[in-house]
């Protein structure tokens, strides 16, 4: 039986051994899957973490947990927010952004998806193009022939079909990714859509600590650095209370 994992901050070999032995009393066997050098846990289902290197694990435990053998020093994301390829590559892995990273798959459970190519039409006019229940799209910059990405939303009182924006597509224009690739429109992809997701990820991590330290490679937490800009002021304030 595989159970959910437990995560223990600053786990020493003694703490790990205690957990292993305690589990055995109740018939469970724990495995030390990984040690993270740093981790930001947003909720029970979403986190971003960096595996500790194999060398550091060996020095700390005398062995290397399985995931750290294969991915030591690499980042891992659980949950959609940090798994988005553009977000993960931009903020964490620093891998090259590929065309596929600029594509979004959209689905609807009822009705169908439509592209409304109305950008060059008079206000109030529409050109609905049927897509289906699933499609892959790229956000397109204004003025480049993009369309509104819509879904069927029932009927009006007069029996006319109503449309609403597909989830996550509002405020942007779109084209099917296959068309973007074939027409070589990669330069027309609206990066603002993806940069917004990057900004939201940074904002989320910043709720729990210093983002620049979290993604940095120096391994020094900002609150322990000796050259904090306010250190001198704090020392001076402390001296004001010295017994003279």
Identify what each model region corresponds to.
Residues 13-244:
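C-terminal, non-catalytic extensions of nucleic-acid polymerases
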């Amino acid at each position: 039986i595989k159970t959910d994992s437990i995560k223990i901050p600053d786990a020493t070999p003694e703490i790990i051994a205690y957990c292993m032995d305690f589990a055995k009393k109740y018939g469970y066997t724990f495995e030390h899957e990984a040690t993270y050098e740093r981790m930001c846990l947003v909720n029970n289902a979403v986190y971003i973490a960096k595996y500790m290197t194999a060398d550091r694990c060996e020095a700390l435990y005398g062995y290397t947990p399985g995931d750290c053998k294969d991915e030591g020093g690499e980042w891992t994301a659980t949950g959609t927010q940090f798994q988005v390829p553009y977000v993960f590559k931009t903020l964490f892995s620093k891998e090259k952004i590929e065309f596929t990273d600029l594509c979004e798959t959209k689905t609807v459970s009822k009705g169908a998806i439509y592209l409304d190519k109305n950008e060059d039409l008079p206000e109030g006019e529409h050109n609905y193009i049927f897509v289906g229940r699933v499609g892959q799209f790229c956000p397109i910059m204004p003025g480049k022939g993009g369309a509104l990405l819509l879904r069927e939303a029932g009927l009006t009182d007069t029996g006319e079909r109503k449309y609403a924006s597909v989830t996550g597509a509002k405020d942007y224009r779109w084209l099917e990714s296959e068309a973007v690739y074939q027409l070589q429109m990669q330069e027309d992809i609206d990066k603002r859509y993806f940069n917004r997701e990057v900004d939201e990820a940074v904002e989320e991590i910043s709720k729990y600590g210093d983002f620049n330290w979290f993604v940095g490679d120096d391994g020094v937490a900002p609150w322990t650095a000796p050259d904090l800009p306010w250190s001198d002021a704090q020392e001076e304030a402390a001296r004001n209370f010295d017994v003279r």
